[in-house]
Amino acid sequence: MIPVRCFSCGKVISSVWEEYRERIKSEPPGKVMDDLGIERYCCRRMLLSHVEVVEMLRRYQ
């Protein structure tokens, strides 16, 4: 689950998550974030460091 907003500045980042996730498979993450308009380093951090915890927790159900 991606957070809806950046923890630091409050900008909505969930709207770009799906496109970001698909595009980083074939393009550098920095270029993708530039194209999507994610310029603040705090918002970039949110996308770069996100770990899909739900997938890891499913193993333990």
Swiss-Prot record:
Its cofactor is Zn(2+). Its EC number is 2.7.7.6. InterPro entries: RNA_pol_su_RPB10 (IPR023580), RNA_pol_suN_Zn-BS (IPR020789), RPABC5/Rpb10 (IPR000268). It comes from the Archaea. One of its GO terms (cellular component) is cytoplasm. One of its GO terms (biological process) is DNA-templated transcription. Keywords: Cytoplasm, DNA-directed RNA polymerase, Metal-binding, Nucleotidyltransferase, Transcription, Transferase, Zinc. The keyword Zinc applies. Pfam families: RNA_pol_N. Part of the RNA polymerase complex. This is DNA-directed RNA polymerase subunit Rpo10.
